[in-house]
Amino acid sequence: MNTNDFDFELPEELIAQTPLEKRDSSKLLIIDHRQKTMVDSHFDHIIDQLNPGDALVMNNTRVLPARLYGEKPDTHGHVELLLLKNTQGDQWEVLAKPAKRLKVGSQVNFGDGHLKATIIDELEHGGRIVEFSYDGIFLEVLESLGEMPLPPYIHEKLEDAERYQTVYAKENGSAAAPTAGLHFTTDLLKKIEAKGVHLVYLTLHVGLGTFRPVSVDNLDEHDMHSEFYSLSEEAAQTLRDVKQAGGRVVAVGTTSIRTLETIGSKFQGDIQADSGWTNIFIKPGYQFKVVDAFSTNFHLPKSTLVMLVSAFAGRDFVLEAYRHAVDEKYRFFSFGDAMFVN
C-alpha cells in the first residue's frame, strides 16, 4: 500500500488549538465498520457503547515537562533540548536545536546551572544522547525548569498544563499525551465502573515519533519508532478473565492498542504480563488479536495512526468517516474530538 492512500483534505481551522472547557463535552463519532454506520454523538455518551463485563483499557503514562531551554557556558549560545526517552540512568535521547553546535563533549547549562547536560553521542536528525548532572531528584528539577512539549501543530499557549494530562496520568515518561484519554473525567470513569465495566491501566511512554510523518511512499519501507510499554500481572489477569467471560477489550487510544497488540502478537493471542520496547506498525492486513473496539481522536493525514484505524475498520470506510467529520466540523488532533470504533 501507498502512503498517499491515507491522505484526506483537512481545513486548517479544524485543527483544535485549545482544549474545551469540559473534557467530556467533545463530540464523538460512533462508527461500526461491519454495519457501515456512523452516528454523531457527544463523548459523555461513550458509556452507552460499553457493556457490563467489558474492560476499558487506558494508558496511565504522564507527560514530562520535557522541553528545556539553556545555554552553552563557553559561548552563551541558546540551546533547546527536547527529552525523547530515558536510555539508562541519567542518560537521555534528546532532540537538540541547534544541533550542529552540540558536538560530543559539549555542555549545556539550565536554570543557573542547577541542571547540566553533557553531549555523549551524536545521532541523526538532530538527535543526541546527553548525560544530566543535578542536585536532588531529577523529576523535581525537570518540573521546575522544563516546559510541556505541545505538538508542532498547536500554536496557542496552554493556560493549564494539566489539560495536556489525562485525569489518571501516573507513570512519568512521555514526550506527548495519549490524547484519546483527555476526554475522560473522574466522574465519567466512576459512572462507567458503576455500570460493571472493568477499568484497566497499562503504560506506554509516548515518543515524538507519534508526530513524525511517514517519509516513504511504500508502507513496507517505513521505519517505525520504538516506545516502552508495560502491562502488570493484575491487569493481564483481568483482561484474560474478561475475554473468557465473553466481554470485550475496549482500548482507549492507539497507544493502548499498540501495547495490547504487541503482547497479543508476542504470546500468540494470549494476554500476559510483559514490558519492553515495541515498534509494532499496525496497517491494513494486520489481524487484531486482543482489541475488540476502541476510542481514538482524529489523526493527521497520511499518519501511521490513520493506518492503524484503517487496519481495524477498513481504509475506505475510515476515510468516509473522516470526510463526514470534516463536513460536520469536528475538531481534529490532540485537543480535538473523538471517534468510537466498533
Swiss-Prot record:
InterPro entries: QueA, QueA_dom1, QueA_dom2, QueA_sf
An example Gene Ontology biological process: tRNA wobble guanine modification
Entry EC number(s): 2.4.99.17
GO CC terms of this entry: cytoplasm
Domain of life: Bacteria
UniProt pathway annotation: tRNA modification; tRNA-queuosine biosynthesis
Keyword field contains S-adenosyl-L-methionine: yes
Keywords carried by this UniProt record: Cytoplasm, Queuosine biosynthesis, S-adenosyl-L-methionine, Transferase
Pfam families associated with the record: Queuosine_synth
Keyword RNA-binding: no
Subcellular location(s) of the protein: Cytoplasm
Main location: cytoplasm
GO-annotated molecular function: S-adenosylmethionine:tRNA ribosyltransferase-isomerase activity
Reaction equation(s) it catalyzes: 7-aminomethyl-7-carbaguanosine(34) in tRNA + S-adenosyl-L-methionine = epoxyqueuosine(34) in tRNA + adenine + L-methionine + 2 H(+)
HAMAP family (alphabetical): QueA (MF_00113)
Cited function: Transfers and isomerizes the ribose moiety from AdoMet to the 7-aminomethyl group of 7-deazaguanine (preQ1-tRNA) to give epoxyqueuosine (oQ-tRNA).
Similarity remark: Belongs to the QueA family.
Subunit organization: Monomer.
Name under which the protein is recorded: S-adenosylmethionine:tRNA ribosyltransferase-isomerase
Organism name: Streptococcus pyogenes serotype M3 (strain ATCC BAA-595 / MGAS315)
Gene name for this UniProt entry: queA
